Amino acid sequence: MSQLEKCDRRSLRSQRALRQALASELAESGDLSRINVASLTERAGLTRRTFYSHYRDIPDFINQIEDGLLAEIRERVELITAAQLPDLYRNIDELEPAPGSVELLRYLAANRDLIGALLGPGGDPAFIKKIIDTSREAVVPRAQTGILGLALGTFFDYYVTYVVSAEVGMIQRWFERGLTESPETMARIMTVIAFVRPGDLYGQPIDINVPEYGMKLLNLQLEDAADTAATVESNN
């Protein structure tokens, strides 16, 4: 083994130890703002010098940790977005999870200490939004493929935001419940819920003609814009 390979392995071990120390510190203190280099390195069994050889400070450390998690999450979300609608319909009929969803949830469960701590009350409030934004970036290009033209624009933007936020919210709730359900069970729940309409729960499904609704919404936007322009002009 070359000296460079030895250094790389040592570096990876140090970073892994710091990650584990962060999860333990958060679990113990419950407050990200109380994390400091001294306590972190002491728990990891490393020197402060080792910490600063990898990170500028605690915020930089947290950002790099989160960026690594987000990259792994995005890779798995992209597997889910690659699924075709006929496959999803078949999955729902057979009560099977969407392709890629089990892999995503298994990854989250495998990193439950760190992710759970970051999502928790004393974690990083911005982390949940980062997950939503990262997932949304992965979903949008795929969701636009084959979509009805009149469903694009404002309606589509809010629709994707709603769906992604709801799915991430379920994951957050899963962590709050202590990951009681297995990744396989949770993946089945999330796959089905994505297609449930509120009225379905009460035996009164609400059918919406999306192209018609999209056209009406566009017309209302144009009318609102015209009214606003007229109001501004009259005030001048």
Model-derived regions: residue spans:
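Hydrophobic alpha-helical connector segments
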Residues: 78-113
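C-terminal peripheral helix-coil segments that are non-catalytic and often amphipathic
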Residues: 140, 144, 156-157, 165, ...
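Alpha-helical structural segments
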Residues: 17-24, 43, 60-83, 99, ...
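Amphipathic alpha-helical segments used for helix-helix packing
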Residues: 102-129, 141-142
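Helix-turn-helix
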Residues: 28-61
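Amphipathic alpha-helical packing segments from all-alpha helical-bundle domains
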Residues: 122-149, 157-168, 199
